[in-house]
Amino acid sequence: MEECQRNIDNTVSTGKEDQEKIDYWKACIIQCQGLITYAHRMAEEAECQAASCTDEKRKKELLAIAENCRVVPEKPPQTFWQAHQMVWFAHVYFQIEVCTTACGFGRFDQYMWPYYKKDVIDEKNITQDEALEMLECFYLKACEVYEVRDKWYATSFAGYPMWEILVVGGQTPDGKDATNELSYLCLEAANQLKTTQPVMAVRTWEGTPEELIRKGCKMIQEGQANPGFFNDYAAMKMTLGKGCTIEEARDWTIVGCIQPGPGGGSTDGSPDAGYVNMGKMIEFVLHNGVDPRTGKLMGLQTGDPREFKNIEEFKDALKKQILHHYKLVTTGYNIMQGIHMLRYPVIFASMVTKGCVESGKSVQQGGAKYSTAGLFITGAANMADSIAAIEKCVYEDKDITMDELIDALDHNFEGQERMRQLLLNKPEKFGNDEAHVDGIYREMMHFIVDEVQQWSDARGGHYSFNVHSQTVNVSHGAVCGATPDGRLSGEPFCDNAIILNHLFLNGRDVFLRIPAICICADSSQSELRLPLLQVVSSNKYFSVGVQSPTEINAPRGRTLSGRQWFCADRNGV
């Protein structure tokens, strides 16, 4: 509040821009006053309950809660408990303001460490068990955050995830290992409760203690699919690409669901600008922009595919189709951002984002130090496999004509199972260390990235491209007909950046490079099987630059060929 008031006092309004800044700072002050009032009301309620409470232990707790709520957020927290209360208030304020998903807790073990160290280690005001109980109470509160979603949203983001990510481990801004006693305690709290929120994320690099990785792996072995492991080196590279310093890159955290972003509250996040369905793009190319489900012209007219002379002409048409639809997505997104900028600025989120108070602009106005928006894709592997199938079966070996292929797809391979098996089995498949089809995938991804990263949104921020589907691959697959990779009409597309389950042919080490990991473990063993720990902590994991968060499923009671195979990709569960 003091900073905003100083800015108001030091600014002379000489025009519209100055007045907008003054209005923004005044709004921040009003917001702060409202947040303090909210906390004081909580204190009054706790005192009211304490007055009628006959349980002395509970009464003491209620009075402590009241005291905490009269300290934070008006003043800085002094204890580990007050720090928890401060973080929770901030989380609730975000939810009140924007009712948002993907509002994570950041590098919890870093900003909470001074309070833990003071209370538990230095002054011994509380025991480690009491600190653990506070963490567990905090985690239970996180489970109370919930969104009621419509049918499409519930299908596309199945399981009603809120993506309240809590990050531990990694590096300090000066490049030292950041793991501390609280890092382990955060995992232990999650291990004991086994709740869906918060989602635990372990940052790993060559300096990460094996004990921390082992603890996370042990949790996975017990069947939690939690925590996820994130590779520092790949994430730092992505973060540096957004223009931040090396210190900010080392301090990276998860912005949104899985996207790495600069730490320290310097980014406005990576909101979901929209998804493009690669299966549908192929359908549009094969039907010259017409949606075969509706008969309407929905895409770009790229010509009759029967006239294409080679695979390069097909890929050129597909690239034009993809860019056309990403431009439609970003046009709609910019319109929405412009409306939000004028009608619905998020004041609290702006207050706690570096650059906004200093510049006098909300995050929608481009006030954040770093600004990005996420563009997403579904069916990436299906696209690569479809291109490879057309190249091999239509243009090279001439097993079928383009007209025959289109007719078979339009009829969902009815009476054409032989053709479908040909498309499924003859061409190379992405993600199996086959250079040609992997090259197709890489070519298409690089093309999209090189294009969209040149674009700016309404806030002046840049777009980041993510192969990241959640379960949108299910809803997108449901509205797409059969595809040239042999997929049937209505079937889900591949999950995120990984390949289709039945096309995983060439082993764990190949799968590491996709990026995602496939590991073999036996969840019935009392001791952790080494392959699980070795893959997560191995040099190979770091050397291939696996950015995709590594989540591991250890199913119980179901054995496949004497082993339990499970794919490791956070949103593929």
Name what the model sees in each region.
Residues A50-K60:
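A conserved hydrophobic secondary-structure block that centers on an alpha-helix together
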Residues E47:
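A basic, often C-terminal nucleic-acid-binding module that engages the phosphate backbone, implemented
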Residues K26-H40:
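Extended non-globular scaffold/tether segments
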Residues M1-A27, E61-V573:
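Conserved catalytic cores of very large enzyme subunits
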